[in-house]
Protein backbone atom coordinates (compact mmCIF):
# COMPACT_ATOMS: atom_id res chain seq x y z
CA UNK A 1 0.00 0.00 0.00
CA UNK A 2 3.02 2.28 0.19
CA UNK A 3 2.27 3.56 3.68
CA UNK A 4 5.70 2.65 5.07
CA UNK A 5 9.24 2.95 3.73
CA UNK A 6 12.02 0.88 5.25
CA UNK A 7 14.44 3.77 5.47
CA UNK A 8 12.09 6.48 6.72
CA UNK A 9 12.62 7.75 10.27
CA UNK A 10 10.63 6.25 13.11
CA UNK A 11 10.05 9.79 14.37
CA UNK A 12 7.45 10.22 11.62
CA UNK A 13 5.22 7.97 13.73
CA UNK A 14 6.72 8.43 17.21
CA UNK A 15 8.00 12.04 17.36
CA UNK A 16 9.99 11.54 20.58
CA UNK A 17 12.55 9.53 18.60
CA UNK A 18 13.50 12.72 16.71
CA UNK A 19 15.56 13.81 19.72
CA UNK A 20 17.07 10.39 20.51
CA UNK A 21 20.30 10.34 22.51
CA UNK A 22 22.85 7.61 23.16
CA UNK A 23 24.33 6.89 26.60
CA UNK A 24 28.14 6.73 26.55
CA UNK A 25 30.75 6.28 29.26
CA UNK A 26 32.88 9.29 30.18
CA UNK A 27 35.62 9.96 32.72
CA UNK A 28 33.02 11.50 35.01
CA UNK A 29 30.48 8.72 34.52
CA UNK A 30 27.96 9.12 31.72
CA UNK A 31 26.97 11.48 28.95
CA UNK A 32 24.08 11.53 26.50
CA UNK A 33 25.19 12.30 22.96
CA UNK A 34 23.09 12.94 19.82
CA UNK A 35 22.51 10.09 17.39
CA UNK A 36 24.65 10.13 14.24
CA UNK A 37 21.64 9.21 12.12
CA UNK A 38 17.89 8.89 12.61
CA UNK A 39 16.42 5.62 13.83
CA UNK A 40 14.68 3.97 10.86
CA UNK A 41 12.04 1.31 10.27
CA UNK A 42 14.71 -0.94 8.74
CA UNK A 43 16.85 -0.67 11.88
CA UNK A 44 13.88 -1.68 14.02
CA UNK A 45 13.33 -4.76 11.85
CA UNK A 46 17.01 -5.74 11.97
CA UNK A 47 17.43 -4.96 15.69
CA UNK A 48 20.13 -2.38 14.93
CA UNK A 49 18.25 0.69 16.19
CA UNK A 50 20.30 0.87 19.39
CA UNK A 51 17.29 -0.15 21.48
CA UNK A 52 17.76 -2.72 24.23
CA UNK A 53 15.61 -3.89 27.12
CA UNK A 54 17.28 -1.36 29.39
CA UNK A 55 19.49 -3.84 31.22
CA UNK A 56 22.79 -2.02 30.60
CA UNK A 57 24.19 -0.23 33.69
CA UNK A 58 24.36 3.12 31.85
CA UNK A 59 20.61 3.22 31.14
CA UNK A 60 19.07 0.87 33.71
CA UNK A 61 17.93 3.64 36.05
CA UNK A 62 16.29 5.56 33.19
CA UNK A 63 14.25 2.50 32.26
CA UNK A 64 13.34 1.78 35.86
CA UNK A 65 12.08 5.34 36.36
CA UNK A 66 9.96 5.02 33.21
CA UNK A 67 8.45 1.71 34.37
CA UNK A 68 10.12 -0.26 31.58
CA UNK A 69 12.45 -3.23 31.39
CA UNK A 70 13.41 -5.91 33.91
CA UNK A 71 14.79 -3.24 36.25
CA UNK A 72 11.22 -2.01 36.76
CA UNK A 73 10.02 -5.50 37.65
CA UNK A 74 7.89 -6.01 34.55
CA UNK A 75 10.04 -8.56 32.78
CA UNK A 76 10.95 -7.77 29.19
CA UNK A 77 7.48 -7.57 27.75
CA UNK A 78 4.58 -5.16 27.92
CA UNK A 79 1.40 -7.23 27.81
CA UNK A 80 0.80 -6.66 31.53
CA UNK A 81 0.31 -2.91 31.12
CA UNK A 82 -3.04 -1.11 31.07
CA UNK A 83 -2.05 1.69 28.69
CA UNK A 84 -2.13 1.70 24.87
CA UNK A 85 1.07 0.46 23.24
CA UNK A 86 1.79 3.85 21.68
CA UNK A 87 1.67 5.55 25.10
CA UNK A 88 4.38 3.13 26.23
CA UNK A 89 6.41 3.67 23.06
CA UNK A 90 6.09 7.47 23.32
CA UNK A 91 7.73 7.14 26.74
CA UNK A 92 10.37 4.75 25.41
CA UNK A 93 11.31 7.34 22.78
CA UNK A 94 12.52 9.69 25.52
CA UNK A 95 14.97 7.15 27.00
CA UNK A 96 18.66 6.83 26.08
CA UNK A 97 19.69 4.32 23.43
CA UNK A 98 22.30 1.67 24.24
CA UNK A 99 24.21 2.22 20.96
CA UNK A 100 24.28 4.42 17.90
CA UNK A 101 21.61 3.41 15.36
CA UNK A 102 23.03 1.12 12.69
CA UNK A 103 26.29 0.43 14.55
CA UNK A 104 25.43 -2.57 16.76
CA UNK A 105 23.03 -5.52 16.88
CA UNK A 106 21.16 -5.33 20.17
CA UNK A 107 17.98 -7.28 20.86
CA UNK A 108 15.36 -5.21 22.61
CA UNK A 109 12.12 -3.28 22.27
CA UNK A 110 12.47 -2.64 18.53
CA UNK A 111 9.63 -4.98 17.55
CA UNK A 112 7.40 -3.45 20.22
CA UNK A 113 8.09 -0.05 18.66
CA UNK A 114 7.04 -1.49 15.30
CA UNK A 115 3.67 -2.39 16.81
CA UNK A 116 3.05 1.29 17.51
CA UNK A 117 4.29 2.23 14.03
CA UNK A 118 1.72 -0.16 12.52
CA UNK A 119 -1.05 1.33 14.65
CA UNK A 120 -0.24 4.89 13.64
CA UNK A 121 0.39 4.13 9.97
CA UNK A 122 -2.85 2.16 9.64
CA UNK A 123 -5.05 4.04 12.08
CA UNK A 124 -6.13 0.68 13.52
CA UNK A 125 -5.34 -0.86 16.92
CA UNK A 126 -2.83 -3.69 16.57
CA UNK A 127 -5.23 -6.41 17.73
CA UNK A 128 -7.79 -5.43 15.09
CA UNK A 129 -5.05 -5.03 12.47
CA UNK A 130 -3.88 -8.60 13.08
CA UNK A 131 -7.45 -9.87 13.00
CA UNK A 132 -8.34 -8.05 9.79
CA UNK A 133 -5.09 -8.56 7.89
CA UNK A 134 -3.75 -11.91 9.17
CA UNK A 135 -5.91 -14.02 11.49
CA UNK A 136 -9.18 -13.58 9.62
CA UNK A 137 -7.88 -14.26 6.10
CA UNK A 138 -5.81 -17.24 7.33
CA UNK A 139 -8.72 -18.64 9.35
CA UNK A 140 -6.65 -18.51 12.54
CA UNK A 141 -9.65 -18.69 14.86
CA UNK A 142 -7.78 -19.32 18.12
CA UNK A 143 -5.28 -16.44 18.14
CA UNK A 144 -5.66 -13.37 20.34
CA UNK A 145 -3.71 -11.01 22.55
CA UNK A 146 -6.25 -11.57 25.34
CA UNK A 147 -8.46 -14.67 24.91
CA UNK A 148 -12.22 -14.25 25.38
CA UNK A 149 -13.36 -15.37 28.83
CA UNK A 150 -15.03 -18.58 27.55
CA UNK A 151 -11.69 -19.69 26.10
CA UNK A 152 -9.66 -19.20 29.29
CA UNK A 153 -10.14 -22.81 30.38
CA UNK A 154 -8.29 -24.01 27.28
CA UNK A 155 -5.01 -22.41 28.36
CA UNK A 156 -2.39 -24.91 29.44
CA UNK A 157 -0.80 -24.72 32.87
CA UNK A 158 2.95 -24.12 33.08
CA UNK A 159 5.22 -26.61 34.84
CA UNK A 160 8.88 -26.55 35.77
CA UNK A 161 11.47 -29.13 36.77
CA UNK A 162 13.15 -28.70 40.16
CA UNK A 163 16.90 -29.31 40.65
CA UNK A 164 15.88 -32.70 42.09
CA UNK A 165 14.08 -33.60 38.87
CA UNK A 166 10.55 -33.24 40.19
CA UNK A 167 7.85 -31.74 37.98
CA UNK A 168 6.00 -28.93 39.78
CA UNK A 169 3.38 -26.40 38.75
CA UNK A 170 4.83 -22.92 38.33
CA UNK A 171 3.54 -20.29 40.79
CA UNK A 172 0.51 -18.22 39.91
CA UNK A 173 1.17 -14.74 38.58
CA UNK A 174 2.34 -13.05 35.39
CA UNK A 175 5.74 -14.74 35.25
CA UNK A 176 4.67 -18.18 36.47
CA UNK A 177 1.33 -18.75 34.74
CA UNK A 178 1.16 -15.76 32.41
CA UNK A 179 -2.03 -14.39 33.94
CA UNK A 180 -1.37 -11.01 32.34
CA UNK A 181 -3.17 -12.42 29.30
CA UNK A 182 -6.46 -12.13 31.18
CA UNK A 183 -8.13 -9.20 29.48
CA UNK A 184 -9.48 -7.03 28.26
CA UNK A 185 -6.44 -4.76 28.05
CA UNK A 186 -5.17 -2.38 25.42
CA UNK A 187 -1.37 -2.66 25.36
CA UNK A 188 -1.08 -4.78 22.22
CA UNK A 189 2.66 -5.29 22.06
CA UNK A 190 4.33 -5.82 18.71
CA UNK A 191 7.02 -7.91 20.37
CA UNK A 192 5.13 -10.39 22.53
CA UNK A 193 1.84 -11.37 24.09
CA UNK A 194 -0.13 -13.33 21.49
CA UNK A 195 -1.88 -16.53 22.54
CA UNK A 196 -2.48 -19.17 19.90
CA UNK A 197 -2.68 -22.88 19.16
CA UNK A 198 -0.26 -25.14 17.32
CA UNK A 199 -2.81 -25.47 14.52
CA UNK A 200 -3.21 -21.73 14.03
CA UNK A 201 0.53 -21.13 14.17
CA UNK A 202 1.09 -23.89 11.62
CA UNK A 203 -1.21 -22.06 9.20
CA UNK A 204 0.81 -18.88 9.66
CA UNK A 205 4.08 -20.72 9.03
CA UNK A 206 2.67 -22.49 5.97
CA UNK A 207 1.70 -19.09 4.57
CA UNK A 208 5.35 -18.02 4.82
CA UNK A 209 6.57 -21.27 3.25
CA UNK A 210 4.13 -20.72 0.38
CA UNK A 211 5.59 -17.29 -0.33
CA UNK A 212 2.91 -15.30 1.48
CA UNK A 213 -0.30 -17.14 0.50
CA UNK A 214 -2.46 -19.91 1.96
CA UNK A 215 -5.75 -21.35 0.71
CA UNK A 216 -6.34 -18.41 -1.59
CA UNK A 217 -5.56 -15.75 1.02
CA UNK A 218 -2.63 -13.57 -0.04
CA UNK A 219 -1.03 -11.96 3.05
CA UNK A 220 2.38 -10.99 1.62
CA UNK A 221 3.87 -10.86 -1.84
CA UNK A 222 6.59 -13.40 -2.69
CA UNK A 223 9.02 -10.48 -3.05
CA UNK A 224 8.22 -9.30 0.48
CA UNK A 225 8.77 -12.77 1.96
CA UNK A 226 12.09 -13.03 0.09
CA UNK A 227 13.15 -9.62 1.42
CA UNK A 228 12.09 -10.51 4.96
CA UNK A 229 14.16 -13.70 4.98
CA UNK A 230 17.30 -12.49 3.18
CA UNK A 231 20.38 -11.81 5.35
CA UNK A 232 20.55 -8.10 6.17
CA UNK A 233 22.99 -8.01 9.10
CA UNK A 234 25.96 -10.35 9.33
CA UNK A 235 29.12 -8.65 10.59
CA UNK A 236 27.20 -7.06 13.49
CA UNK A 237 25.35 -10.26 14.41
CA UNK A 238 26.71 -12.16 17.39
CA UNK A 239 26.43 -15.78 16.20
CA UNK A 240 29.05 -17.19 13.76
CA UNK A 241 27.52 -18.69 10.65
CA UNK A 242 24.28 -16.77 11.20
CA UNK A 243 22.88 -13.48 9.98
CA UNK A 244 19.80 -11.46 10.84
CA UNK A 245 17.16 -10.43 8.33
CA UNK A 246 14.08 -8.22 8.69
CA UNK A 247 12.95 -10.00 11.84
CA UNK A 248 14.51 -13.46 11.51
CA UNK A 249 17.78 -15.22 12.24
CA UNK A 250 19.07 -16.78 9.01
CA UNK A 251 21.45 -19.74 8.78
CA UNK A 252 24.30 -18.99 6.37
CA UNK A 253 26.98 -21.56 7.23
CA UNK A 254 25.84 -24.68 9.14
CA UNK A 255 29.40 -25.77 9.85
CA UNK A 256 30.45 -22.42 11.25
CA UNK A 257 27.22 -22.14 13.22
CA UNK A 258 27.67 -25.65 14.61
CA UNK A 259 24.13 -26.80 13.98
CA UNK A 260 22.11 -28.87 11.55
CA UNK A 261 19.98 -27.14 8.96
CA UNK A 262 19.81 -25.91 5.41
CA UNK A 263 21.38 -22.68 4.25
CA UNK A 264 18.69 -20.03 4.32
CA UNK A 265 16.75 -21.59 7.19
CA UNK A 266 15.10 -18.74 9.08
CA UNK A 267 13.25 -18.29 12.34
CA UNK A 268 13.45 -16.91 15.84
CA UNK A 269 13.09 -18.45 19.27
CA UNK A 270 10.04 -17.77 21.37
CA UNK A 271 9.96 -17.01 25.06
CA UNK A 272 7.45 -17.41 27.84
At which residue positions do the language-model features occur?
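Acidic-enriched catalytic cores of C-N bond-cleaving enzymes acting on peptides and small amides
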Residues: 10
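Short, surface-exposed loop or secondary-structure junction motifs
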Residues: 15, 19-260
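Low-complexity, glycine/alanine/valine/leucine- and proline-rich hydrophobic stretches
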Residues: 259-272
Amino acid sequence: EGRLRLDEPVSRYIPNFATARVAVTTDSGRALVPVHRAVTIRQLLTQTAGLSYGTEPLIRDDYRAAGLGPAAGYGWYLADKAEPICATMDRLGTLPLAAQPGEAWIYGYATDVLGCVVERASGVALDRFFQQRIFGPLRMRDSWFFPPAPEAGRLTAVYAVTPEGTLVRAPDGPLGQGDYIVGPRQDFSGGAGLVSTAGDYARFLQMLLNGGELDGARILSPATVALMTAPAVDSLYYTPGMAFSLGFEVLQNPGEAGEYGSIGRYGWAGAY
